[in-house]
Amino acid sequence: MWIIAFRRQDSLNRIFYTQGDYGLFQCSEPCHKETYDNEEIIKKMVLSQGFQIKDGELQKPEDGEIKLTVPFSLIPYCPRCGKPMSMNLRSDQTFVEDEGWHQAAERYEKFIQEHKKQKIVFLELGVGYNTPGIIKYPFWQMTNTFQHAFYVCLNQGEAYAPEEIRKKSVCMNEEVRKSVGRERV
């Protein structure tokens, strides 16, 4: 789940992954507050299962046989303590907010403060109630507080806006994958 603040000059430093980033590993313990890019190891894992990557697109094996395991040698371990690595996702108290996360949080807060009197859309895609205080409730509060704010929620089975902001909201009870982009492998 992402909070994304877009402007015309989009770039990666304008994205704040407040709930984490599937593209990063962290120590599962965690023994330290650092994350690691996992793109190369994930590609190796995917290829080891028989998939192919052509023109940046993931393709099923030609024979249709997908291996459901990866070689032991591809399992990542923490370079400091040796424990298994895990995805950098906010699921419990082990979530690592590294330096990059804190820098992104500051950029996000600055963006909100600089634009709160302008037209702003809070777009919520597939956010549930696992940790509503991180994305959902702040979006509702800012929509209610900021005069020109608008809230858009796309979430199958959980598309909802409180009464206080319903006139400034659009809620769509649809699956994000089918509504926003084409389905992938």
Identify the meaning behind each predicted range.
Residues M1-V185:
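Conserved catalytic alpha/beta core of Sir2/sirtuin-type deacylases, generalized to analogous enzyme cores
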